[in-house]
Amino acid sequence: MSRVYVFDHPLIQHKVTYIRDKNTGTKEFRELVDEVTTLMGYEITRDMPLEEITIETPVATCQSNVIAGKKVGLVPILRAGLGMVDGLMRLIPAAKVGHVGLYRDPETLQPIEYYVKLPSDVAERELIVTDPMLATGGSAVAALTALKKRGAKNLKLMCLIAAPEGIKLVQDEHPDVDIYVAAVDEYLNDHGYIVPGLGDAGDRLYGTK
């Protein structure tokens, strides 16, 4: 069974409050998502493997640690997941970025795949899949399935806010994928929105309706 990590750091919780606030404008919303993603990024990369190398400082030769092997790959679920990429790239500037394009049918709430573009070495990378909202879980499950079909083996799912229904579906369908979130909310309403949630993350990031 996949594990769920909820980040309760005071800075993250403070910023999530203003992400939720309907009076937060597009510019500030975008900045807050970026900031929270960076803060979460420190923790989600905590288990990255290290290897020791020899370097020379201005004073002496010494042994020091660097990240071992291939570095992280980032895979935002379009379009809202794009809002989380820069915050992670700030920490991992060498990361390669793939994209999975999905949209949710407004009637069935089922995800429809329209675009997948990935680095050629996804099987060798730890991939962090980003999407601000884990609501029904359908989009996350579809994205993870698409990545595994293309060779991905080491996957993590990073969201800002999740509903219990979405967490359960991901755990049922992809028990090997750990889930990292800033908050777990109460439930989904009849329209598939997380309650209390933050509304439509994509619309709030890009100023659309």
From Swiss-Prot:
Cofactor or coenzyme needed: Mg(2+)
User: GO biological process annotations for this chain's record?
Assistant: UMP salvage; uracil salvage
Q: How is its activity regulated?
A: Allosterically activated by GTP.
Give its E.C. classification number.
2.4.2.9
CDD domains given for it? PRTases_typeI
Give me the comment on cofactor binding: Binds 1 Mg(2+) ion per subunit. The magnesium is bound as Mg-PRPP.
Q: Which residues bind 5-phospho-alpha-D-ribose 1-diphosphate?
A: R79, R104, D131, P132, M133, L134, A135, T136, G137, G138, S139, D200
Q: Which residues form a coiled coil?
A: none
Gene3D superfamilies in the cross-refs = 3.40.50.2020
Q: In which pathway does it act?
A: Pyrimidine metabolism; UMP biosynthesis via salvage pathway; UMP from uracil: step 1/1
User: Which PANTHER family is this protein grouped with?
Assistant: ADENINE PHOSPHORIBOSYLTRANSFERASE (PTHR32315), URACIL PHOSPHORIBOSYLTRANSFERASE, CHLOROPLASTIC (PTHR32315:SF4)
Query: Which family, according to UniProt?
Result: Belongs to the UPRTase family.
This one is known as: Uracil phosphoribosyltransferase
What is the organism of origin for this protein? Answer: Brevibacillus brevis (strain 47 / JCM 6285 / NBRC 100599)
Query: Which gene produces this protein?
Result: upp
